[in-house]
From Swiss-Prot:
Name of the protein described by the UniProt record: Ribosome biogenesis protein RLP24
One of the record's GO molecular function terms: structural constituent of ribosome
Region Disordered, residue ranges: 140-188
UniProt keywords, alphabetically: Cytoplasm, Nucleus, Ribosome biogenesis
Chief location category: cytoplasm
Entries under InterPro entries matching the protein: L24e/L24_sf, Ribosomal_eL24, Ribosomal_eL24-rel_N, Ribosomal_eL24_CS, TRASH_dom
SMART domains attached to this UniProt entry: TRASH
Protein species of origin: Yarrowia lipolytica (strain CLIB 122 / E 150) (Yeast)
Compartments (UniProt record): Cytoplasm; Nucleus
Length: 188
C-alpha cells in the first residue's frame, strides 16, 4: 500500500480513497476526488485551474527546481532489508523535510517581498480618490478619545478608594490593568 498522487491536482491519494481510471492502453490515472475525475474527463488543463499544484508551479507560486524534491521520486528497485539502512533513511527523510520546509519559507518570503510596497501604493491611491474616508476616521477617533477620558476618570476614583484596603499583590494587579487601559488608549 502506498500513497499515490492525484493525476489532476497532485494531492495525495491514500489507500482506499479516491478513484482509479484505467485507460484502454492500461495506463492508470488516480484521482483524489470526483472533482478531479470530472475535470479530467472534460479534458481540462490542470495548469489553467488555479486550485491545482500544476497551476501553482507554472505560475511560480511553488518551488519547481530543488534538490529536495527529487527525494520524493518513486524508486522501484527492491533493496534487501537492513536495519541500519532503514534507520539512516528515516533520519535522512526528517532532515530532507526540514530543509525543504526552510527552502519553501525562503521562497515564499522572496516571492512576497515586493507586496508591501504595492499595497502601500494601492492605499495611497484609495486615499487620494476618497479623502472623505480619512475625515470620518478622524471624527471617530476623537469621539472614542472623549468617551474614553470620561470613563477613565470614574475608574480612577473607584480604584483609589479600593487600593487603600487591598494588599500589595492586589495593587500589582490593578497597576497592570491601568497600564493595559493606557496602552489601549494609545493604540486607538
Amino acid at each position: 500500500m502506498r500513497v499515490y498522487n492525484c493525476h489532476f491536482c497532485s494531492s495525495p491519494v491514500y489507500p482506499g480513497k479516491g478513484i482509479m481510471f484505467v485507460r484502454n492502453d492500461s495506463k492508470e490515472f488516480r484521482f483524489c476526488r470526483s472533482k478531479c475525475h470530472k475535470n479530467f474527463k472534460m479534458k481540462r488543463n490542470p495548469r489553467k485551474l488555479r486550485w491545482t499544484k500544476a497551476f501553482r508551479k507554472a505560475a511560480g507560486k511553488e518551488m519547481v527546481v530543488d534538490s529536495t524534491l527529487a527525494f520524493s521520486a518513486r524508486r522501484d528497485v527492491p533493496v534487501r532489508y537492513n536495519r541500519d539502512l532503514v534507520e539512516k533513511t528515516l533520519e535522512a527523510m526528517e532532515k530532507v523535510e526540514e530543509i525543504r520546509l526552510k527552502r519553501e519559507r525562503a521562497f515564499y518570503k522572496n516571492r512576497m517581498r515586493g507586496n508591501k510596497a504595492a499595497q502601500l501604493e494601492e492605499d495611497r491611491k484609495l486615499v487620494e480618490a476618497h479623502p472623505e474616508l480619512l475625515r470620518e476616521r478622524e471624527v471617530e477617533l476623537r469621539r472614542m478619545q472623549e468617551a474614553g477620558e470620561d470613563d477613565d476618570d470614574e475608574d480612577m476614583s473607584e480604584m483609589e478608594v479600593s487600593e487603600e484596603e487591598e494588599s500589595e499583590e492586589e495593587r500589582e494587579k490593578v497597576e497592570i490593568a491601568l497600564k493595559s487601559k493606557s496602552k489601549r488608549k494609545m493604540r486607538a
